[in-house]
Curated annotation (Swiss-Prot):
Description of how the protein assembles with itself and partners: Homotetramer.
Protein species of origin: Parvibaculum lavamentivorans (strain DS-1 / DSM 13023 / NCIMB 13966)
Molecular functions (GO terms): argininosuccinate synthase activity; ATP binding
Reactions accelerated catalytically: L-citrulline + L-aspartate + ATP = 2-(N(omega)-L-arginino)succinate + AMP + diphosphate + H(+)
Binding residues annotated for ATP, in chain numbering: 14-22, 41, 122
EC number: 6.3.4.5
Name of protein: Argininosuccinate synthase
Pathway(s) it belongs to: Amino-acid biosynthesis; L-arginine biosynthesis; L-arginine from L-ornithine and carbamoyl phosphate: step 2/3
InterPro entries: Arginosuc_syn_C, Arginosuc_syn_N, Arginosuc_synth, Arginosuc_synth_CS, Arginosuc_synth_type_1_subfam, AS_cat/multimer_dom_body, Rossmann-like_a/b/a_fold
Family to which this protein belongs: Belongs to the argininosuccinate synthase family. Type 1 subfamily.
NCBIfam families: argG, PRK00509.1
Residues annotated for L-citrulline binding in this entry: 92, 97, 128, 132, 183, 192, 268, 280
Transmembrane region(s): none
Protein backbone atom coordinates (compact mmCIF):
# COMPACT_ATOMS: atom_id res chain seq x y z
CA UNK A 1 0.00 0.00 0.00
CA UNK A 2 1.40 3.39 -0.98
CA UNK A 3 1.87 6.24 1.44
CA UNK A 4 -0.71 8.21 -0.51
CA UNK A 5 -3.41 5.75 0.55
CA UNK A 6 -2.37 4.90 4.11
CA UNK A 7 -3.75 8.14 5.50
CA UNK A 8 -7.32 7.73 4.22
CA UNK A 9 -9.72 8.90 6.91
CA UNK A 10 -13.13 8.48 5.32
CA UNK A 11 -14.14 6.81 2.05
CA UNK A 12 -17.38 6.83 0.06
CA UNK A 13 -18.02 3.33 -1.30
CA UNK A 14 -20.30 2.71 -4.29
CA UNK A 15 -22.27 -0.04 -2.56
CA UNK A 16 -24.79 -2.42 -4.09
CA UNK A 17 -25.11 -4.77 -1.14
CA UNK A 18 -23.96 -7.65 -3.32
CA UNK A 19 -21.06 -10.02 -2.79
CA UNK A 20 -18.25 -7.86 -4.16
CA UNK A 21 -19.05 -4.59 -2.44
CA UNK A 22 -19.99 -6.25 0.86
CA UNK A 23 -16.60 -7.95 0.94
CA UNK A 24 -14.98 -4.65 -0.03
CA UNK A 25 -16.73 -2.86 2.83
CA UNK A 26 -15.29 -5.27 5.39
CA UNK A 27 -11.90 -5.24 3.66
CA UNK A 28 -11.76 -1.43 3.78
CA UNK A 29 -12.44 -1.49 7.50
CA UNK A 30 -9.75 -4.09 8.12
CA UNK A 31 -7.10 -2.84 5.68
CA UNK A 32 -7.45 0.93 5.85
CA UNK A 33 -8.95 1.30 9.31
CA UNK A 34 -11.01 4.18 7.95
CA UNK A 35 -14.62 5.21 8.27
CA UNK A 36 -16.76 3.93 5.40
CA UNK A 37 -19.75 5.80 3.97
CA UNK A 38 -21.93 3.66 1.70
CA UNK A 39 -23.79 5.04 -1.29
CA UNK A 40 -26.42 2.92 -3.03
CA UNK A 41 -28.06 4.33 -6.15
CA UNK A 42 -31.54 3.25 -7.16
CA UNK A 43 -31.24 3.35 -10.94
CA UNK A 44 -34.23 1.09 -11.48
CA UNK A 45 -32.42 -2.20 -10.99
CA UNK A 46 -35.71 -3.66 -9.83
CA UNK A 47 -34.62 -5.03 -6.49
CA UNK A 48 -35.38 -4.03 -2.92
CA UNK A 49 -32.61 -1.78 -1.64
CA UNK A 50 -33.37 -1.96 2.07
CA UNK A 51 -31.35 -5.21 2.41
CA UNK A 52 -28.32 -3.16 1.35
CA UNK A 53 -29.01 -0.77 4.23
CA UNK A 54 -29.39 -3.62 6.71
CA UNK A 55 -26.19 -5.28 5.53
CA UNK A 56 -24.27 -2.00 5.81
CA UNK A 57 -25.65 -1.45 9.31
CA UNK A 58 -24.66 -5.01 10.25
CA UNK A 59 -21.11 -4.21 9.12
CA UNK A 60 -21.00 -1.13 11.34
CA UNK A 61 -21.58 1.66 8.81
CA UNK A 62 -22.95 4.85 10.36
CA UNK A 63 -23.50 7.01 7.25
CA UNK A 64 -25.65 5.22 4.68
CA UNK A 65 -26.95 6.92 1.54
CA UNK A 66 -29.66 5.24 -0.53
CA UNK A 67 -31.02 7.53 -3.24
CA UNK A 68 -33.69 7.21 -5.91
CA UNK A 69 -31.94 8.52 -9.02
CA UNK A 70 -34.19 6.94 -11.63
CA UNK A 71 -35.58 10.16 -13.08
CA UNK A 72 -32.20 11.87 -13.19
CA UNK A 73 -30.65 8.77 -14.73
CA UNK A 74 -33.10 8.58 -17.62
CA UNK A 75 -33.56 12.34 -18.12
CA UNK A 76 -29.92 13.47 -17.95
CA UNK A 77 -28.01 10.41 -19.13
CA UNK A 78 -30.12 7.84 -21.01
CA UNK A 79 -32.18 10.29 -23.08
CA UNK A 80 -29.21 12.44 -24.20
CA UNK A 81 -27.47 9.24 -25.30
CA UNK A 82 -30.54 8.07 -27.23
CA UNK A 83 -30.73 11.40 -29.05
CA UNK A 84 -27.47 10.24 -30.62
CA UNK A 85 -28.80 6.72 -31.39
CA UNK A 86 -25.64 5.53 -29.64
CA UNK A 87 -24.78 1.87 -30.21
CA UNK A 88 -21.37 0.35 -29.45
CA UNK A 89 -19.96 -2.08 -32.03
CA UNK A 90 -23.25 -2.17 -33.88
CA UNK A 91 -25.39 -3.82 -31.21
CA UNK A 92 -24.70 -2.81 -27.59
CA UNK A 93 -26.99 -0.09 -26.19
CA UNK A 94 -24.50 0.89 -23.44
CA UNK A 95 -26.71 0.04 -20.47
CA UNK A 96 -23.81 -0.43 -18.05
CA UNK A 97 -21.62 2.33 -19.45
CA UNK A 98 -24.21 5.11 -19.14
CA UNK A 99 -24.89 4.41 -15.45
CA UNK A 100 -21.33 4.95 -14.25
CA UNK A 101 -21.07 8.74 -14.74
CA UNK A 102 -24.07 9.39 -12.48
CA UNK A 103 -22.82 7.07 -9.73
CA UNK A 104 -19.38 8.69 -9.85
CA UNK A 105 -20.96 12.15 -9.74
CA UNK A 106 -22.98 11.36 -6.61
CA UNK A 107 -19.99 9.72 -4.91
CA UNK A 108 -17.97 12.89 -5.38
CA UNK A 109 -20.87 15.04 -4.13
CA UNK A 110 -21.36 12.85 -1.06
CA UNK A 111 -17.63 12.90 -0.36
CA UNK A 112 -17.81 16.69 -0.35
CA UNK A 113 -20.87 16.68 1.94
CA UNK A 114 -19.42 14.20 4.45
CA UNK A 115 -15.82 15.39 4.41
CA UNK A 116 -14.56 12.12 2.91
CA UNK A 117 -11.11 12.22 1.36
CA UNK A 118 -11.47 9.08 -0.78
CA UNK A 119 -13.88 7.17 -2.99
CA UNK A 120 -14.00 3.44 -3.73
CA UNK A 121 -15.59 1.25 -6.40
CA UNK A 122 -15.96 -2.51 -6.73
CA UNK A 123 -14.87 -2.91 -10.33
CA UNK A 124 -12.35 -5.59 -11.20
CA UNK A 125 -8.93 -4.87 -12.63
CA UNK A 126 -9.93 -6.65 -15.85
CA UNK A 127 -12.98 -4.63 -16.74
CA UNK A 128 -14.15 -1.35 -18.19
CA UNK A 129 -15.93 -0.04 -15.11
CA UNK A 130 -12.73 0.73 -13.22
CA UNK A 131 -11.85 3.11 -16.05
CA UNK A 132 -15.32 4.64 -16.23
CA UNK A 133 -15.52 5.33 -12.50
CA UNK A 134 -12.02 6.70 -12.20
CA UNK A 135 -12.25 8.94 -15.27
CA UNK A 136 -15.40 10.36 -13.70
CA UNK A 137 -13.68 10.93 -10.36
CA UNK A 138 -10.76 12.63 -12.10
CA UNK A 139 -13.04 14.94 -14.07
CA UNK A 140 -15.16 15.93 -11.06
CA UNK A 141 -12.52 16.07 -8.30
CA UNK A 142 -8.94 15.45 -9.43
CA UNK A 143 -7.69 15.66 -5.82
CA UNK A 144 -9.83 12.82 -4.43
CA UNK A 145 -8.07 9.62 -3.40
CA UNK A 146 -9.22 6.48 -5.17
CA UNK A 147 -9.29 2.97 -3.73
CA UNK A 148 -9.67 0.09 -6.19
CA UNK A 149 -9.60 -3.10 -4.05
CA UNK A 150 -9.44 -5.53 -6.96
CA UNK A 151 -6.08 -4.02 -7.88
CA UNK A 152 -4.75 -4.27 -4.32
CA UNK A 153 -5.97 -7.36 -2.51
CA UNK A 154 -5.17 -11.04 -2.92
CA UNK A 155 -8.80 -12.09 -3.41
CA UNK A 156 -8.23 -12.89 -7.06
CA UNK A 157 -11.41 -14.84 -7.87
CA UNK A 158 -15.08 -14.98 -6.98
CA UNK A 159 -14.40 -18.24 -5.15
CA UNK A 160 -11.98 -16.45 -2.82
CA UNK A 161 -14.51 -13.66 -2.36
CA UNK A 162 -17.11 -16.18 -1.23
CA UNK A 163 -14.62 -17.76 1.16
CA UNK A 164 -13.85 -14.32 2.64
CA UNK A 165 -17.57 -13.59 3.01
CA UNK A 166 -18.23 -16.89 4.75
CA UNK A 167 -15.27 -16.37 7.08
CA UNK A 168 -16.63 -12.97 8.13
CA UNK A 169 -20.26 -14.13 8.20
CA UNK A 170 -21.30 -11.80 5.39
CA UNK A 171 -24.60 -13.01 3.86
CA UNK A 172 -24.26 -14.17 0.24
CA UNK A 173 -27.16 -13.81 -2.18
CA UNK A 174 -28.17 -16.91 -4.12
CA UNK A 175 -29.85 -17.07 -7.50
CA UNK A 176 -33.14 -18.89 -8.04
CA UNK A 177 -31.21 -22.13 -8.54
CA UNK A 178 -29.56 -21.82 -5.12
CA UNK A 179 -26.15 -20.91 -6.54
CA UNK A 180 -23.93 -17.87 -6.15
CA UNK A 181 -25.19 -15.44 -8.81
CA UNK A 182 -23.73 -14.42 -12.12
CA UNK A 183 -21.92 -11.12 -12.24
CA UNK A 184 -24.99 -8.96 -12.85
CA UNK A 185 -25.45 -5.28 -13.63
CA UNK A 186 -28.96 -3.88 -13.73
CA UNK A 187 -30.67 -0.54 -14.09
CA UNK A 188 -33.77 0.88 -15.73
CA UNK A 189 -32.18 0.63 -19.18
CA UNK A 190 -30.90 -2.94 -19.08
CA UNK A 191 -29.74 -5.99 -17.17
CA UNK A 192 -26.58 -7.92 -18.03
CA UNK A 193 -25.06 -11.21 -16.89
CA UNK A 194 -21.45 -12.37 -17.17
CA UNK A 195 -19.36 -15.22 -15.81
CA UNK A 196 -19.99 -18.86 -14.90
CA UNK A 197 -21.38 -20.83 -17.88
CA UNK A 198 -21.37 -17.68 -20.02
CA UNK A 199 -17.58 -17.50 -20.15
CA UNK A 200 -17.41 -19.97 -23.06
CA UNK A 201 -18.76 -18.02 -26.05
CA UNK A 202 -19.46 -21.27 -27.92
CA UNK A 203 -22.18 -22.32 -25.46
CA UNK A 204 -25.75 -21.08 -25.72
CA UNK A 205 -26.87 -19.07 -22.70
CA UNK A 206 -29.34 -21.06 -20.59
CA UNK A 207 -32.84 -19.64 -20.39
CA UNK A 208 -32.62 -19.04 -16.63
CA UNK A 209 -30.11 -16.23 -17.28
CA UNK A 210 -32.91 -14.04 -18.66
CA UNK A 211 -35.15 -12.15 -16.29
CA UNK A 212 -36.69 -9.15 -18.10
CA UNK A 213 -38.07 -10.76 -21.24
CA UNK A 214 -39.94 -13.86 -22.32
CA UNK A 215 -38.52 -16.11 -25.00
CA UNK A 216 -39.57 -14.68 -28.36
CA UNK A 217 -41.09 -18.07 -29.19
CA UNK A 218 -43.27 -17.82 -26.07
CA UNK A 219 -44.39 -14.24 -26.65
CA UNK A 220 -48.07 -13.60 -27.45
CA UNK A 221 -49.34 -14.72 -30.84
CA UNK A 222 -51.12 -11.38 -31.22
CA UNK A 223 -48.95 -8.30 -31.82
CA UNK A 224 -48.96 -5.32 -29.48
CA UNK A 225 -49.28 -1.88 -31.05
CA UNK A 226 -47.83 1.13 -29.27
CA UNK A 227 -47.44 4.80 -30.17
CA UNK A 228 -44.46 6.72 -28.78
CA UNK A 229 -44.62 10.52 -28.75
CA UNK A 230 -41.49 12.67 -29.05
CA UNK A 231 -40.61 16.28 -28.29
CA UNK A 232 -37.22 17.59 -29.42
CA UNK A 233 -35.75 14.11 -29.61
CA UNK A 234 -36.95 12.80 -26.26
CA UNK A 235 -39.81 10.35 -25.75
CA UNK A 236 -42.58 12.02 -23.73
CA UNK A 237 -45.68 9.87 -24.11
CA UNK A 238 -47.02 6.39 -24.78
CA UNK A 239 -50.35 6.05 -26.57
CA UNK A 240 -51.00 9.74 -25.96
CA UNK A 241 -50.40 9.61 -22.20
CA UNK A 242 -47.64 11.96 -21.01
CA UNK A 243 -45.12 10.30 -18.69
CA UNK A 244 -41.96 11.19 -16.82
CA UNK A 245 -38.74 9.81 -18.35
CA UNK A 246 -38.36 6.97 -15.84
CA UNK A 247 -42.05 6.04 -15.96
CA UNK A 248 -41.97 5.97 -19.75
CA UNK A 249 -38.91 3.73 -19.92
CA UNK A 250 -40.44 1.43 -17.30
CA UNK A 251 -43.57 1.09 -19.44
CA UNK A 252 -41.53 0.37 -22.58
CA UNK A 253 -39.61 -2.27 -20.63
CA UNK A 254 -42.89 -3.96 -19.72
CA UNK A 255 -44.20 -3.86 -23.30
CA UNK A 256 -40.92 -4.92 -24.87
CA UNK A 257 -40.19 -7.65 -22.35
CA UNK A 258 -43.66 -9.16 -22.70
CA UNK A 259 -43.03 -9.48 -26.45
CA UNK A 260 -39.54 -10.98 -26.19
CA UNK A 261 -37.75 -7.84 -27.41
CA UNK A 262 -34.23 -6.70 -26.51
CA UNK A 263 -32.23 -9.89 -25.93
CA UNK A 264 -28.57 -9.80 -26.92
CA UNK A 265 -25.77 -12.36 -26.62
CA UNK A 266 -22.65 -10.32 -27.21
CA UNK A 267 -18.88 -10.64 -27.40
CA UNK A 268 -17.50 -7.12 -27.06
CA UNK A 269 -14.09 -5.49 -27.18
CA UNK A 270 -13.32 -4.06 -23.77
CA UNK A 271 -11.41 -0.79 -23.49
CA UNK A 272 -8.70 -2.61 -21.50
CA UNK A 273 -7.94 -4.84 -24.49
CA UNK A 274 -9.65 -8.19 -23.98
CA UNK A 275 -12.88 -9.59 -25.37
CA UNK A 276 -15.73 -10.51 -23.03
CA UNK A 277 -19.02 -12.31 -23.46
CA UNK A 278 -22.21 -11.11 -21.83
CA UNK A 279 -25.94 -11.58 -22.11
CA UNK A 280 -27.97 -8.38 -22.16
CA UNK A 281 -31.67 -7.55 -21.99
CA UNK A 282 -32.70 -4.05 -23.06
CA UNK A 283 -36.39 -4.32 -23.96
CA UNK A 284 -37.50 -0.71 -23.52
CA UNK A 285 -34.29 0.72 -24.91
CA UNK A 286 -34.56 -1.41 -28.04
CA UNK A 287 -38.10 -0.16 -28.69
CA UNK A 288 -37.03 3.42 -27.96
CA UNK A 289 -34.09 3.28 -30.39
CA UNK A 290 -36.27 1.97 -33.23
CA UNK A 291 -38.88 4.64 -32.52
CA UNK A 292 -36.36 7.48 -32.31
CA UNK A 293 -34.67 6.57 -35.58
CA UNK A 294 -38.09 6.46 -37.24
CA UNK A 295 -38.91 9.89 -35.84
CA UNK A 296 -35.66 11.26 -37.22
CA UNK A 297 -36.32 9.67 -40.62
CA UNK A 298 -39.03 12.22 -41.42
CA UNK A 299 -37.73 15.23 -39.49
CA UNK A 300 -33.97 15.34 -40.12
CA UNK A 301 -32.45 16.68 -43.31
CA UNK A 302 -30.37 14.11 -45.19
CA UNK A 303 -27.07 15.88 -44.55
CA UNK A 304 -27.76 16.23 -40.83
CA UNK A 305 -28.90 12.61 -40.56
CA UNK A 306 -25.84 11.28 -42.36
CA UNK A 307 -23.47 13.41 -40.29
CA UNK A 308 -25.10 12.10 -37.11
CA UNK A 309 -24.65 8.54 -38.34
CA UNK A 310 -20.97 9.22 -39.03
CA UNK A 311 -20.38 10.70 -35.58
CA UNK A 312 -22.43 8.14 -33.64
CA UNK A 313 -19.74 5.42 -33.37
CA UNK A 314 -17.30 7.95 -31.92
CA UNK A 315 -19.90 9.21 -29.45
CA UNK A 316 -20.78 5.65 -28.43
CA UNK A 317 -17.11 4.78 -27.98
CA UNK A 318 -16.61 7.79 -25.71
CA UNK A 319 -19.42 6.62 -23.45
CA UNK A 320 -18.28 3.00 -23.53
CA UNK A 321 -14.73 3.99 -22.58
CA UNK A 322 -15.83 6.26 -19.75
CA UNK A 323 -15.40 9.73 -21.25
CA UNK A 324 -18.89 11.06 -20.47
CA UNK A 325 -17.40 14.11 -18.73
CA UNK A 326 -14.89 14.83 -21.51
CA UNK A 327 -15.02 18.04 -23.58
CA UNK A 328 -15.31 16.08 -26.81
CA UNK A 329 -18.43 14.25 -25.60
CA UNK A 330 -19.96 17.56 -24.55
CA UNK A 331 -19.07 19.07 -27.94
CA UNK A 332 -20.74 16.19 -29.75
CA UNK A 333 -23.74 16.42 -27.43
CA UNK A 334 -24.23 20.09 -28.33
CA UNK A 335 -24.25 19.19 -32.03
CA UNK A 336 -26.61 16.27 -31.46
CA UNK A 337 -29.00 18.34 -29.35
CA UNK A 338 -29.08 21.03 -32.06
CA UNK A 339 -30.15 18.36 -34.55
CA UNK A 340 -33.11 17.38 -32.36
CA UNK A 341 -34.93 20.72 -32.37
CA UNK A 342 -37.55 19.49 -34.86
CA UNK A 343 -37.57 15.80 -33.87
CA UNK A 344 -41.14 16.03 -32.61
CA UNK A 345 -44.12 13.86 -33.45
CA UNK A 346 -45.20 10.27 -32.95
CA UNK A 347 -44.16 6.80 -34.08
CA UNK A 348 -46.39 3.73 -34.14
CA UNK A 349 -44.77 0.35 -33.66
CA UNK A 350 -45.80 -3.29 -33.78
CA UNK A 351 -44.19 -5.44 -31.08
CA UNK A 352 -44.25 -9.11 -31.98
CA UNK A 353 -42.12 -12.10 -30.97
CA UNK A 354 -38.81 -10.35 -30.49
CA UNK A 355 -39.26 -7.66 -33.14
CA UNK A 356 -40.14 -3.97 -32.90
CA UNK A 357 -41.35 -2.86 -36.32
CA UNK A 358 -42.28 0.68 -37.30
CA UNK A 359 -45.72 0.82 -38.91
CA UNK A 360 -46.33 4.58 -38.94
CA UNK A 361 -44.76 7.96 -38.21
CA UNK A 362 -45.98 11.57 -38.29
CA UNK A 363 -44.69 15.01 -37.35
CA UNK A 364 -45.77 18.64 -37.66
CA UNK A 365 -42.19 19.24 -38.88
CA UNK A 366 -42.06 16.38 -41.37
CA UNK A 367 -39.83 16.79 -44.42
CA UNK A 368 -41.67 13.99 -46.17
CA UNK A 369 -43.59 15.48 -49.11
CA UNK A 370 -46.23 13.22 -50.62
CA UNK A 371 -46.67 15.74 -53.43
CA UNK A 372 -43.08 15.22 -54.51
CA UNK A 373 -42.72 11.49 -53.98
CA UNK A 374 -46.06 10.28 -55.37
CA UNK A 375 -46.20 7.87 -58.32
CA UNK A 376 -49.41 9.59 -59.37
CA UNK A 377 -49.86 13.04 -60.95
CA UNK A 378 -47.87 15.53 -58.88
CA UNK A 379 -49.45 18.72 -60.28
CA UNK A 380 -46.07 20.17 -61.19
CA UNK A 381 -44.44 19.71 -57.79
CA UNK A 382 -41.46 18.00 -59.39
CA UNK A 383 -40.20 18.26 -62.96
CA UNK A 384 -38.63 14.91 -63.82
CA UNK A 385 -36.70 16.49 -66.68
CA UNK A 386 -34.55 18.28 -64.08
CA UNK A 387 -33.04 14.91 -63.18
CA UNK A 388 -31.17 14.79 -66.49
CA UNK A 389 -28.96 17.77 -65.64
CA UNK A 390 -28.51 16.56 -62.08
CA UNK A 391 -27.28 13.19 -63.28
CA UNK A 392 -25.10 14.70 -66.00
CA UNK A 393 -23.27 16.97 -63.52
CA UNK A 394 -22.77 14.16 -61.02
CA UNK A 395 -21.48 11.92 -63.79
CA UNK A 396 -18.93 14.48 -65.02
CA UNK A 397 -16.01 13.20 -62.95
CA UNK A 398 -16.82 9.62 -63.91
CA UNK A 399 -16.83 10.53 -67.61
CA UNK A 400 -13.51 12.37 -67.26
CA UNK A 401 -12.02 9.42 -65.39
CA UNK A 402 -13.21 6.98 -68.06
CA UNK A 403 -11.79 9.20 -70.82
CA UNK A 404 -8.38 9.30 -69.12
CA UNK A 405 -8.36 5.55 -68.60
CA UNK A 406 -9.22 4.97 -72.24
CA UNK A 407 -6.34 7.24 -73.34
CA UNK A 408 -3.79 5.45 -71.17
CA UNK A 409 -4.82 2.06 -72.56
CA UNK A 410 -3.79 3.04 -76.09
Amino acid sequence: MSGATKDVKKVVLAYSGGLDTSVILKWLQETYGCEVVTFTADLGQGEELEPARKKAEMLGVKEIYIEDLREEFVRDFVFPMFRANAVYEGVYLLGTSIARPLIAKRQIEIARQTGADAVCHGSTGKGNDQVRFELGYAALNPEIKIIAPWREWDLTSRTKLIEFAEKHQIPIAKDKRGEAPFSVDANLLHISAEGKVLEDPADEAPEYVYSRSVRPEDAPDTPTYVEVGFEKGDAVSIDGVKMSPATLLTKLNELGGANGIGRLDLVENRFVGMKSRGVYETPGGTVLLVAHRAMESITLDRGAAHLKDELMPRYAELIYNGFWWSPEREMLQALIDKSQEMVTGSVRLKLYKGMATVVGRSSPYSLYSMAHVTFEEDAGAYDQKDAAGFIRLNALRLRLLAARNNRTKK
